[in-house]
Amino acid sequence: MAVFLLLLALGLLLAKPSESRMKGTTEQFSQEEMQPAAKQTLEESANSTLSDKNTGLSISKHVMSATPLTPRRLSFIIPKGNTMRDGRNCVNSLRVWRTEVDGNASCQLGNDFIHGSMDVSLRIPKATRGKCEQTPKPSSSGSLGLERTTCKVLAGHQCLRSHEHSITSLKKILTVLASNSLMSWLVSGCKL
C-alpha cells in the first residue's frame, strides 16, 4: 500500500504542468480557397490555461502574395500579461499584424495549438487581412491564469468560428492512476 501511495504521489507530481510552454500558432495561406466577395469577419478565440507568468503565445504568419516569388513572413511573441486597447494599440511589446493579400491569392489558416502531446488543428478558409489581440482574464483557481487570444481576419466569405481550448492534466492523472493501479496489482500478485 505504501508503494502504491508513493507511486501515486510521483505520478501526480509528473502529471502536474511544470512551466507549461504555450502554443505556437501557424497560419499559412494557400491558393484555391480564395473567392472574391464582400469582406466578412472571422473571429477565432482560443482560451488557454496558463500556469506561469513567463509563458507566452508565439504566432507566426506566412503570407504568399499573388506572385509566388514574393513570400512574406510576419511573426511576434505575446508575453502573458500584455493587453490590447480597442483592438488597435498594444501595451508593452505586442504588435498588431495586418496583412493585405491580393484578390487573386487565397488564404488558408491552419492553427495548431500544442500543449504537451495534445494537438488541436483548425482549418479556416481564406483571409485578406487580420489582427490579433490578447486579453488576460483571471481564473477561479489562484495560480492559474486564463488568457484569451482573439484573431480577427477579414475574409472573402463569412466563416465565424469560436473555439475555446482549455488544457488540464486530467488525462495524464487518469493515465498515471491506471498504471499505478496495475503496478500495485502486479506487485501484490507476485507476493502471493
UniProtKB/Swiss-Prot annotation:
GO cellular component terms listed in the entry, alphabetical order: extracellular region
Biased composition (Polar residues): 43-54
Record: glycosylation sites: N47, N104
Chain positions covered by the region annotation Disordered: 21-54
Any GO molecular function: nucleic acid binding
Signal peptide: 1-15
Record's subcellular location: Secreted
Key words, A-Z: Glycoprotein, Secreted, Signal
Main localization category: secreted
InterPro entries linked to this entry: RNaseA (IPR001427)
Family: Belongs to the pancreatic ribonuclease family.
Protein name: Putative inactive ribonuclease 11
Species this protein is from: Mus musculus (Mouse)
Gene name for this UniProt entry: Rnase11
